[in-house]
Amino acid sequence: MAKAKRTTKFVCQACGYESAKWMGKCPNCNEWNQMVEALEPSKKSRSAFNHTGEPSKATPITQIASETEKRVETNMPELNRVLGGGVVPGSMVLVGGDPGIGKSTLLLQVSAQLTLTNKKVLYISGEESIKQTKLRAERLQVSGDNLYVYAETNLEAVQETIDFVKPDFVVIDSIQTVYHSDVTSAAGSVSQVRECTATLMRIAKMQNIAIFIVGHVTKEGAIAGPRLLEHMVDTVLYFEGERHHAYRILRAVKNRFGSTNEMGIFEMRDVGLVEVANPSEVFLEERLEGASGSTVVASMEGTRPVLVEIQALVSPTMFGNAKRMATGIDYNKVSLIMAVLEKRVGLMLQNQDAYLKAAGGVKLDEPAVDLAVAVSVASSYRDKPTRSTDCFIGELGLTGEIRRVARIEQRVQEAAKLGFKRIFIPKNNEGNWKIPKDVQVVGVETIGEALKKALPD
């Protein structure tokens, strides 16, 4: 009997767009020279990828027994917080980040911590030999009889090893190096990444194994390949930070089992990653007192308030158009706030260059940072510093009003804990909550009122 003919298609390596013919430019993402030929998987292999759990039948939701899945804590509180309290058995976690940021270091340390809970961990490296992994483990002072290391990129061999070792946790470093023999395209292609991830997901669900996979990122900072990879997994973590700075930030951008607003702080040292228990002190330890353009905001990262310094430098432009730059703060937010300052306060900023930065490499995207940004710009423009013990919390409206923000009591308590004596908050946030001792809470209704009190003439 003749074999069924397998059809050929062309897949964009940037976005996953499929076409029956080759094209120089992808019509979906407009990238050039990204179309790669690939064969459709056979029906036999494709059917295995689609299954993600034990056989089941349609059941009324009222007849399904509710179970609370016990999480496994990693002995790393910062990671536990980001994951929502620990690792959920049977889940699949994708960890992305720039090259050299510390993804492999983080997962090797996590593997060692999990073995301390009498769990068996299989670390599969597609980028290093087992001897190279051993050298890195020695540098990180990582060891344990329950930590197994395996260097392989063939997915069938990986499956056999998982069946033999029977681990509780598996680490794949990285998904772009793993390939499936039923898929003809090269490792790291859209087809390979999709099929390998689907197979690993099936293993995780059927055998109740938590799997961590490392994903490469593009030059724009997104996970390489189509967004399908991020849709398939349960949790997506991004490991951020400047390679030339010691601090690293772990964020969850997707989490089926917890919040996506949590943040974990780590410091890279010669012995690996060390957790930072109080990030507010870290972000403020190098603040220069008496400098204009410097303010502090209490920002919420999930359930944790974090104090961050916002710096602004405003100076007359030397060219026709004023220049605006922002690091860690949304550029559009900065433009909006400066427009409000011009219209509602009368600051002549149209011929001023403005450079803003959230110190410490933190990214601030919540509305409560608006007031601190506005005061820092005005402080630099007038060359008049705020008090070193002032903290600013509030959202700025287009009419110049200061709008209420959530969890004001937690923010104020965190600021008071670090020695801030005068805290500016929205007038509407004043209410029946406990104000810390020796702290003056100043409620303001407009940005003009806030500037008069923070930067008096």
Curated annotation (Swiss-Prot):
A motif (RadA KNRFG motif) lies at residues 254-258. It comes from the Bacteria. It is an enzyme of class 3 (hydrolase). ATP binds at G97, D98, P99, G100, I101, G102, K103, S104. Its EC number is 3.6.4.-. A zinc finger (C4-type) spans 12-29. GO terms for biological process: recombinational repair. It holds the Pfam family Zn_ribbon_LapB. Has a putative N-terminal zinc-finger, a middle region with homology to RecA with ATPase motifs including the RadA KNRFG motif, while the C-terminus is homologous to Lon protease. HAMAP family: RadA_bact (MF_01498). DNA-dependent ATPase involved in processing of recombination intermediates, plays a role in repairing DNA breaks. Stimulates the branch migration of RecA-mediated strand transfer reactions, allowing the 3' invading strand to extend heteroduplex DNA faster. Binds ssDNA in the presence of ADP but not other nucleotides, has ATPase activity that is stimulated by ssDNA and various branched DNA structures, but inhibited by SSB. Does not have RecA's homology-searching function. This is DNA repair protein RadA. It comes from Listeria monocytogenes serovar 1/2a (strain ATCC BAA-679 / EGD-e).
